């Protein structure tokens, strides 16, 4: 089972349970339209064999995030978040050159960012999620501290050049993640998110040393 930010499509006969009060009718419509939910971090409240999911509604519906639980066995399909190159054609026309510039810089560093948040949901649903103040939320698979430092520099320069805010996380080894802005800071400890919890870890623990085979 994939972790946080993964996209899941439920079976038509899935027996999911709404956690957000009153959300069941809207969730029924959502899944009937063939739309996915996103995997949320486990908090220990879900039943064995089940997963916490979220459905973020567009601004026209108050940007409410609907929470639900579903059995893992009721998942018909599960994929990684959309890549930036897949999202770019669905973004507002004025923003597309900025995203293309970021994509080119990422490729130059052998990085392939994934997208979550408003830009991703607009591409997935065809509904209007992106507005003038929308941030670009990105997930960056990173394997080494050298890659992380290069990425921080890349993102800082891109924001300065284009005026669009890029939020998101560095996806670290062992299914951990850290906010890239926090990583760019000077604190000796950073907040690390996993599929099950959040905890403070020293920077030195983010990239475990791997012995040669």
Swiss-Prot record:
Keywords: Nucleotidyltransferase, Transferase. The keyword Cell inner membrane does not apply. The active site is at 135, 137. InterPro entries: Holo-ACP_synthase, MdcG_C, MdcG_N. Signal peptide: none annotated. It catalyses: apo-[malonate decarboxylase ACP] + 2'-(5''-triphospho-alpha-D-ribosyl)-3'-dephospho-CoA = holo-[malonate decarboxylase ACP] + diphosphate. The keyword Transferase applies. One of its GO terms (molecular function) is nucleotidyltransferase activity. Its EC number is 2.7.7.66. Transfers 2'-(5-triphosphoribosyl)-3'-dephosphocoenzyme-A to the apo-[acyl-carrier-protein] of the malonate decarboxylase to yield holo-[acyl-carrier-protein]. Belongs to the MdcG family. This is Phosphoribosyl-dephospho-CoA transferase.
């Amino acid at each position: 089972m994939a972790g946080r930010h993964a996209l899941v499509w439920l079976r038509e006969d899935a027996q999911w349970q709404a956690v957000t009060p009153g959300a069941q009718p809207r969730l029924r419509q959502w899944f009937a339209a063939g739309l996915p939910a996103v995997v949320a971090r486990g908090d220990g409240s879900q039943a064995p064999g089940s997963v916490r999911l979220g459905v973020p509604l567009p601004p026209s519906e108050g940007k409410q995030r609907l929470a639900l639980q579903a059995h893992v066995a009721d998942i018909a399909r599960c994929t990684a978040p959309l890549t930036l190159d897949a999202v770019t054609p669905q973004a507002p026309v004025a923003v597309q050159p900025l995203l293309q510039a970021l994509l080119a810089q990422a490729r130059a560093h052998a990085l392939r960012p994934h997208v979550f948040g408003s830009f991703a949901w607009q591409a997935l649903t065809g509904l209007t999620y992106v507005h003038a103040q929308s941030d670009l939320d990105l997930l960056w698979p990173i394997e080494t501290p050298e890659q992380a430092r290069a990425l921080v520099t890349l993102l800082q320069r891109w924001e300065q050049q284009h005026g669009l805010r890029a939020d998101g996380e560095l996806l670290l080894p062992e299914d951990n993640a850290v906010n890239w802005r926090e990583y760019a800071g000077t604190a000796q400890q950073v907040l690390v998110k996993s599929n099950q919890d959040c905890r403070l870890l020293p920077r030195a623990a983010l990239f475990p040393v791997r012995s040669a085979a």
